[in-house]
């Protein structure tokens, strides 16, 4: 199982390396990886049929509940757990972003057309692009784990890999400022649903 996981992670790294030119800049690339981690948390929760609630805001449905929160926040390999470990290994003398505050901010702004991730962009406008990338990589993601609970982990490990690359190429100062946006985008996109 672990060997399959490593091979599929390698295929995902190849995909992102080959398609990196389609990302306008390095920061957007990292934030996109965060979005994919968030969406993988939702996909796992839906397919594992963990508890969830569809909430309507601004005429759209959004995905809330314990199921997605389990993969985002609570499991031993949750997105936040892995991101916190990464942050602490890279920035020992800095505090990890207040993810509870970020999560509350996201929850209170779901569906707000004027909301911007870290003041940069509206996630609703980026969602179709994130779905396209998700659909491009979904077969590889499925092969990475025979259980959906592994999907958020493999994508978070891909993000971890590219954080290492980013750190080496551009330094820690830029990366540390990206952490809140990566987390915020993951949280927001974990709530979004592909509408028919």
Predicted regions and their residues:
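Solvent-exposed interaction surfaces and binding hotspots enriched for charged
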Residues: 1-196
